[in-house]
Amino acid sequence: MSDLSRLALEHQRKRTELSERVARRAARLWRSVQASDIDASWDRIAPALGQVVSAGQLQAARMAAGYTSAAARAQGVAGPGQIIPEAFTGATLEGREIVPELFAAATTTKRLIGRGVGVGSAFQAGTALMSILAATTVRDSGNMADKVSGLRRGRTVQYARMVSPGACSRCAILAGVGHFTKHFERHPECRCTTVPIYSDNPNAPLPEGLYGSPADYFESLSKAEQDRIYTKAGAEAIRMGADPVSVVNARRGMFRVQQPGRLVARATPRTLVAPDGRTFQAYVTTENRMRFGSQYRVDGSRRSSSVRLMPETIISMSEGDPVRAVELLRQFGYVP
């Protein structure tokens, strides 16, 4: 395994440990909710939940500059990778505010109780969902910060997926390398991260431990691991020449997360105007102007007239120019 791959795996391990700590803290807060009045209990813990997850996002974002700087040095590339970590807090990947998203744990619990599921089992389901959402939100912020930090070197950059050890088939079929404008796809509980690759030759061989395609990743696995990840029948089909993506997608789709606890193709965008006057479709978030309270029981969110763009949308506006991408990220407050 290359030094770059080892560096990326260590970064991934630390990011995973952080997200799991945040998930445990969020779950502890959730367990204080009283079954006799879930909504009132939620209103009491909501501020603390928001603080716990936002603090985790901040820690995750602060890890980015050191990681991407080390990854760049390993490839003989210099340049600043500073970001504004605070800009990566307070919102989910899709641009929704954190606490209303976490309220899915409460709605899920209430729905199960209403269907006759025992209170204990219903709360266990709510705890599991709370843990998933909290951890995913932290990992997403870290991945966005990694991507933004990796751009700040005035070089053409691609991002290789560092597939998490023990990954599932949905992650395995996303192994590969893509242009920096490509969205980072993932599912709930995905632990994969990215590695910035600096090369003027997009066809240059990747360092050992990184894979250019789902097929390359499949070939790197032992037969036992192939069977575990893709199922015995699926793995045998791939060994006989079937496309790994087709085999996995025949069983289940791969989508980005939109609403808590379910998978959808893409969040609904809004039309916004950039500082240079161009209009575009964007995934946005409000600027923390909601109040904790009954709105969570109505529709799970509260929108304001103020919005800010998420990094992936801003990067997509750059038309493939990394210098332009950094300029836009600076305009929107993600880099100094």
Regions found by a protein language model. Name each.
Residues 192:
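Glycine-rich, flexible loop motifs
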Residues 189:
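Acidic/histidine-rich catalytic cores and adjacent linkers
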Residues 1-186, 197-336:
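Domain-core detector
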